[in-house]
Amino acid sequence: MRKLPLGLLPVLIFLAVFFAAPLLINLLESLRGPDGARGIAQFIRIFGDAYYLAVIGQTLLFGLVVTLACALMGYPLGYAVARAEGAFKIVLIFVVVTPLLVNVVVRSFGWLVILGGSGAINAAMRALGLPQLDLIYNWLGVGIAMVHVLLPFMALSVAGTLETLDRRVEDAARVLGAPPLRVFWHVTLPVSAQGLITGCILCFTLSIGSF
């Protein structure tokens, strides 16, 4: 049986004190009722109320949709980052992380300018003689903004795992006659699955927490 490296001990102590302990305290406090008695009556009341169940269901559905959108767009973006070289790779990484560098107020105002009734999209719709779209103050607008913020987490997670893939393995599969789709499905995707799963977990937890 392998022993735990002593170098991990400070990290584990830090996580226990500043992460695990507060979560445990919050859990214990959530069991305390108005009269000070502990029990699960509060949880029974919440999960027995249709309103709270609807809120929880909408939150989980929103998180799933945002995570799926991030996966569909973030995987190709992460693949491009992993395969890029030289100065183009640096530029591409900068473009990917830009949403995380912009202040939330500036970012929100930017989306209002783009998606609002007088924004660029609706201005183009009016110019084409098409009806105006309702893109803000609804699920769609929030989802678009959330995907914009969380996409870097997905792309960088995928790119990080693809960086570990030896391209000679893909080349060997092609030399043996495997078509590009088969190479991706049997070689590239399994290697990047860990990064994809990590990105999905990050996007899902952050999206439901923000929503």
List the predicted regions and their residue ranges.
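Membrane-water interface segments at the C-terminal ends of transmembrane alpha-helices
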Residues: 2-34, 50-163, 187-211
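A short amphipathic helical element positioned immediately N-terminal to and/or at the very start
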Residues: 38-47
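Short coil/turn motifs that cap or connect alpha-helices
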Residues: 131, 178-180
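Short glycine/proline-centered loop/turn elements that form peptide/ligand docking sites
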Residues: 165-169
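The alpha-helix within a helix-turn-helix
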Residues: 173
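Glycine/proline-centered hinge or cleavage motifs at structural transition points of membrane proteins
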Residues: 176-177, 190
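Conserved acidic donor-binding loop of glycosyltransferase catalytic domains
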Residues: 183-184
